[in-house]
Swiss-Prot record:
Pfam families: DUF1292. This is UPF0473 protein CPE1777. NCBIfam families: PRK13678.2-3. The lineage of its organism: Bacteria, Bacillati, Bacillota, Clostridia, Eubacteriales. Belongs to the UPF0473 family. It comes from the Bacteria. InterPro entries: UPF0473 (IPR009711). It comes from Clostridium perfringens (strain 13 / Type A).
Length: 84
């Protein structure tokens, strides 16, 4: 786990704020991803991609593409294996 990344707060569609711990950041095929774990729920990990919104600002969007999820899982497994 990359401990030098600070927790982030995300706001859902209903305006509810949730704090997430950053498990790690991955750069895959010129795209940037964050693996996030809701605070207090270390067994849950959510993959988010850095995207630009309509104003050109960087924001996070959930990864829903099965191919991208598989790439992220493989990259994370490789990273985890290297840390052991």
């Amino acid at each position: 786990m990359n401990n030098d990344l600070q927790p982030i707060v995300l706001v859902d569609e209903e305006g509810i704020e949730t704090t997430f711990n950053v498990v790690t950041k991955l750069d895959i095929e010129e795209k940037e991803y964050f693996l996030l774990s809701p605070e207090g729920e270390e067994d849950v990990v959510i993959a988010m991609q850095v995207v630009q919104d309509e104003d050109g600002e960087e924001t996070l969007a959930p990864v829903e593409n099965d191919f991208e999820i598989e790439m992220i899982e493989e990259a994370y497994a490789t990273l985890f294996a290297e840390e052991e």
